């Protein structure tokens, strides 16, 4: 069990988007706040703070997690990928391209979490049906699009990733 005296921070060492970071933070610091405030990676959004909306979705040790209910200290030693880590050489990831090309975003608030959930989902289901896509993104909420274009984008992304 980790014992921390009042006013002391805990050391958190994580690999985010391929880069190791080591910071001292309050034991109560949430992973989403660590990513945004300590690392300056603001693509990951804070929506509900209750794991309901999925805007804070990141990949941690190969699994999709909602970073608003994970303590930064729990992520110590973890490998994390955020939306900023998907693209390379200033080029969009195929999932990002599919979302753009299929008009799968409007206000954009949910987009980073939706794309990260899609990334995880397509690793597990590279050739999904529409029904599987709808089930695979069910924990991520979009108030703007009605999901039709998001589902089309996920199906399109699966084709792009397979070719």
From Swiss-Prot:
<protein>
    <recommendedName>
        <fullName>Glyceraldehyde dehydrogenase small chain</fullName>
        <ecNumber>1.2.99.8</ecNumber>
    </recommendedName>
</protein>
<keyword id="KW-0560">Oxidoreductase</keyword>
<keyword id="KW-0408">Iron</keyword>
<feature type="binding site">
    <location>
        <position position="53"/>
    </location>
    <ligand>
        <name>[2Fe-2S] cluster 1</name>
    </ligand>
</feature>
<keyword id="KW-0411">Iron-sulfur</keyword>
<dbReference type="GO" id="GO:0005737">
    <property type="term" value="C:cytoplasm"/>
</dbReference>
<dbReference type="InterPro" id="IPR051452">
    <property type="entry name" value="Diverse_Oxidoreductases"/>
</dbReference>
<keyword id="KW-0479">Metal-binding</keyword>
<feature type="binding site">
    <location>
        <position position="110"/>
    </location>
    <ligand>
        <name>[2Fe-2S] cluster 2</name>
    </ligand>
</feature>
<dbReference type="Pfam" id="PF00111">
    <property type="entry name" value="Fer2"/>
</dbReference>
<feature type="binding site">
    <location>
        <position position="48"/>
    </location>
    <ligand>
        <name>[2Fe-2S] cluster 1</name>
    </ligand>
</feature>
<dbReference type="InterPro" id="IPR002888">
    <property type="entry name" value="2Fe-2S-bd"/>
</dbReference>
<dbReference type="InterPro" id="IPR001041">
    <property type="entry name" value="2Fe-2S_ferredoxin-type"/>
</dbReference>
<dbReference type="InterPro" id="IPR036884">
    <property type="entry name" value="2Fe-2S-bd_dom_sf"/>
</dbReference>
<dbReference type="GO" id="GO:0046872">
    <property type="term" value="F:metal ion binding"/>
</dbReference>
<feature type="binding site">
    <location>
        <position position="107"/>
    </location>
    <ligand>
        <name>[2Fe-2S] cluster 2</name>
    </ligand>
</feature>
<feature type="domain" description="2Fe-2S ferredoxin-type">
    <location>
        <begin position="10"/>
        <end position="86"/>
    </location>
</feature>
<dbReference type="GO" id="GO:0016903">
    <property type="term" value="F:oxidoreductase activity, acting on the aldehyde or oxo group of donors"/>
</dbReference>
<dbReference type="InterPro" id="IPR012675">
    <property type="entry name" value="Beta-grasp_dom_sf"/>
</dbReference>
<dbReference type="GO" id="GO:0051537">
    <property type="term" value="F:2 iron, 2 sulfur cluster binding"/>
</dbReference>
<feature type="binding site">
    <location>
        <position position="56"/>
    </location>
    <ligand>
        <name>[2Fe-2S] cluster 1</name>
    </ligand>
</feature>
<comment type="subunit">
    <text>Heterotrimer composed of a large chain (CutA), a medium chain (CutB) and a small chain (CutC).</text>
</comment>
<comment type="function">
    <text>Component of the glyceraldehyde dehydrogenase which is involved the nonphosphorylated Entner-Doudoroff pathway. Catalyzes the oxidation of D-glyceraldehyde to yield glycerate. When the artificial electron acceptor 2,6-dichlorophenol-indophenol (Cl2Ind) is used, the enzyme shows a broad substrate range (glyceraldehyde-3-phosphate, formaldehyde, acetaldehyde, propionaldehyde and isobutyraldehyde), but is most active with D-glyceraldehyde. It is not known which acceptor is utilized in vivo.</text>
</comment>
<feature type="binding site">
    <location>
        <position position="142"/>
    </location>
    <ligand>
        <name>[2Fe-2S] cluster 2</name>
    </ligand>
</feature>
<dbReference type="InterPro" id="IPR036010">
    <property type="entry name" value="2Fe-2S_ferredoxin-like_sf"/>
</dbReference>
<feature type="binding site">
    <location>
        <position position="68"/>
    </location>
    <ligand>
        <name>[2Fe-2S] cluster 1</name>
    </ligand>
</feature>
<keyword id="KW-0001">2Fe-2S</keyword>
<dbReference type="Pfam" id="PF01799">
    <property type="entry name" value="Fer2_2"/>
</dbReference>
<dbReference type="InterPro" id="IPR053590">
    <property type="entry name" value="Glyceraldehyde_DH_small"/>
</dbReference>
<feature type="binding site">
    <location>
        <position position="144"/>
    </location>
    <ligand>
        <name>[2Fe-2S] cluster 2</name>
    </ligand>
</feature>
<keyword id="KW-0963">Cytoplasm</keyword>
<dbReference type="GO" id="GO:0043795">
    <property type="term" value="F:glyceraldehyde oxidoreductase activity"/>
</dbReference>
